[in-house]
Amino acid sequence: CNVPTQNVISNYDVENLYELPRMLLDQKMDDLVLQHLQINAPAAHMDEWDALVNRVKNLNQELNIALVGKYVQLPDAYLSVNEALRHAGYYVNSVVNIDFINSEELNKENVAERLKDADGIIVPGGFGDRGIAGMIDAIECTY
């Protein structure tokens, strides 16, 4: 297909997505793109990125977070919260385990038992009255 061999970049599977920029840099993809677009740019400094990748690969703690909401049965309903928690975990050197708890199933009698293993609780906002009582019970729980 008339692509010069030196312009073929391998995109191997990586254990963690954060390893991809380093893999592409090691194949000089940045230089190829800059050259093709006739752009002069300084060399990439990857020290901080490499440190992040190393941290992500060597997390040595776990945090259990209870996410109490009314849309927990929908996989992507709290995607931005999930990703924010994962990234916060990187900062504190921890794998974050999220326990999705349906707020409609919480009440004053079961909330302490349901949240007892949580290191933290997040109650994302929602619309309407459905599940609000369980959210409030979670917020007020001091087990």
Put a short name on every predicted segment.
Residues C1-Y143:
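N-terminal beta1-alpha1 cap of cysteine-dependent amidohydrolase-like domains
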